[in-house]
Amino acid sequence: MSSSPASSPGPVSPASSRRGSPRRPEWAGRNYTLLTGAAVITNLGSHGALIATAFAVVQAGGSAGDVGLVAAARTLPLVLFLLIGGAIADRIPRHHVMVAANALNCVSQAVFAFLVLTGDPQLWQMMLLTALCGTGTAFFNPAAEGMLMASVSGPHANRAFALFRMAMNGAGVGGAALGGAMVALLGPGWVLAVDAAAFAAAGALRAFLDVGHIAERAPGGGLLTDLREGWVEFRSRPWLWSIVLQFSVVVAVVGAAEAVYGPLVALERLGGAAPWGVALAFFGLGTIGGAVLMMVWKPRRLLLAGTLCVFPLALPSAGLAVPLPVWGLCLVMFVSGAAIEVFGVSWMTTMHQEIPEEMFSRVSAYDWFGSLSMLPLATAVAGPVESAIGRTSALWGCAALVVVVTAAVLLVPDVRHMTRKPSATIGPDTESGGNAGALDLAKPSPADPSPAAV
């Protein structure tokens, strides 16, 4: 890890203020409310589905390598189609892209659930279905970020992003805990079915988003022209591409550790799916704590504060390497969750103030593409690396890489010196619809590779 005047809350008269009528904040308009509700529903399903997918592979007789292949099958099309998704999202109404992507994810998860509930699915079937889910996410993410950025006005950006992510991550806490418990009690198939239903419900909400306030682009050019324009915007900003390079490594190693090694450590050393679900829930609790902090804290040096908070993302890999008892793993997951949320809000605020709205989905697509580019390889080779050097050494290596690349990106002057601009000079004009509406989506959260979600 992003409205029409008709959906704006409108002015508050002195008389209505005296009557004390309950009102939402002026920036929490219709689009913001719909997107927040849809994100909550999606995260309730998806966090449990991440656990269920790994355990479905193991239940079908799969190995660590098979778990990695299924994870890679999801992330590979996600990476391949992100740039096209970003270009399309800047050309047609973004909510149409979001609804279509949700429909694809709903169908793929429903079929996956059916196969798991009616028998042992084949590895190729699980890979195909997760690949379809990844394809939907590739088109969804840039459109969702663009919609979010167009829905929040500059003066309220920091608080709006923090509140949005707090609601989304709060749902993730419940989803991870409930998903882990459901896998243990009912099996992974029912959790995948719940995820399919969540995509259907969220897509229905997103169908009502209003994009009438967003100016239509002038005709001319094609997808390749759009991609070139996005690339020029992306490469012209050293702070942007350097942090994307950093996260290409961070997301890869943390994603491999938590998507492949984490469930196996839980199964062999911690007691199964339920304790792992609790640990992921504590990551979510940490993100809520970080979001609460960012509701009131506005660091002047946005990227310096955010980047320093990437170092704690090494802790979960180290905790799995030891391995820590469940309570210790929950503690390090909480700390890393709070830290990544500080980064996430700082990153979203920086993007909001620096990137033109009409370019945002394309620039966001390059961000996602770079950040996720190494994740398919990392998850695919996690099994062979474990066989070659052992799981403990692999996990310590993941932790070390997070520390090294984060220290390296602090050498970039723009990362150290990027400052928060006066709020009156950034963000969409509040009189052109900025108040009307608000995924996951700053950097992809390592514990939530579906991004909204590392």
Give residue ranges: language-model regions.
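Alpha-helical transmembrane-bundle signature of multi-pass membrane transport and export proteins
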Residues: 2-444, 449-454
